[in-house]
Amino acid sequence: MGAVKRSHHQVDVDTEGKDSHRFREAGANPVALTGGGLFFFTEKTEVVYNPALIARWFAGKADIVIMEGFKSESVPRLQFADLAHMAEKDDNYVVGFITAETAGFPREFGGKPVFNRDDAEGIGEWLVGSFIPSLGKGI
């Protein structure tokens, strides 16, 4: 599984005072940092990366990519919502709901599954079974 977090704020995974930060501050673009079994790649860009383009970077490295922060994109998504607001949060791209409710909530809303936010195992099994059927066998 891969993961992407989209932010509407300036982000920086580099540390001031480190060589890679100094390279970038001096105008190097892009800058990569590797070591200890990790690889980071940063690039200043005006490009707005959409989920399909980002997912290509994960090809061959992850069976599924979880992306947070792309709610205006036309991609399948699990929608966080309390019970009172599920109907207004539902649209053609919502494939299921996640709620903070801990007991007595419906397991389905509008034909879509509803999960408690702490049910990582249930959410994971549903994702695999729904989006990676070949891996879902035997779960």
Which role fits each region the language model picked out?
Residues M1-H9, G104, P133, I139:
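Walker A (P-loop) phosphate-binding motif
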Residues M1-T45:
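N-terminal phosphate/diphosphate-binding loop that engages ATP/GTP or pyrophosphate donors
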Residues G17, V48, R117, E121:
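Electropositive phosphate-/nucleotide-binding environments in soluble metabolic enzymes
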Residues K18-R22, Y49-N50, A84-H85:
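Short, hinge-like loop/turn segments at secondary-structure boundaries
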Residues G27, G60-K61, D91:
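Short loop/turn elements that form and flank the Walker-type P-loop nucleotide-binding site
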Residues T42-S72:
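Phosphate-binding/switch loop-helix module in NTP-utilizing enzymes
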Residues I64-K137:
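Phosphate/Mg2+-binding loops and adjacent switch elements
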